[in-house]
Amino acid sequence: YKMTDREGNVWLWQDGNGCRKVTYMNGEFTSVVFKKENNNLPSNNITYISEDEQGRIWIGSHDGIAQVVGDKAVLVEENHDAFKMMSFGKDVFFLSGTGTISLKREGEDSRIVTRLGEGSKVYSTMRLQNDWIVFTEDGSYVFNLRTHQVSRDTELNIARGQVQIDNRGNFWIYNHTGKVWYVNAKTRFVKSFQLIPADKVNYIDEERYHIVHDSRDI
């Protein structure tokens, strides 16, 4: 996996092997290896590396979340099976693989703000303005990043939804039913398409889509 931060540093990682930060400066490449064995990473089981709106780097793992400070990653939340991070202003939210959402603010300890459902497995997420939509085993939940309120999305209550983003930044959701939902990221307009007949979809092990808008808006 690869992530490039705003400073141009490239972060490379593989679950179980820690990560590497690669920097290009003055015509030379240098790198720092973050690994538990090097005492600069709490866990090698990395699930994501993300940058927030303030430019801070967060490393999520199956064993907790760490913030990168200099050339070391400092543990900020233990016993958290990290799935996704979401930045909202100066606030940072962490979502676990079983639907627990925690909040981290500058100068404060991380704290749990809500739990979605009864520990349902999380499949994917997407953001629509101030709403963080989380697709789980038992449908979708809407977490408002400003108010921290949770609701159920009736129009997008899609169990086991997987999200794909097209070349215009809009969302497409599918869940092995042969049906695909289009969501406009700006207007929140939703339209569904039955691309594979429901009685044929079980012949397919895994749905795969590649969605592109062309210059004719098709």
Regions found by a protein language model. Give the residues of each.
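Carboxylate-rich, polar loop motifs that coordinate divalent cations or form catalytic acidic clusters
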Residues: 1-218
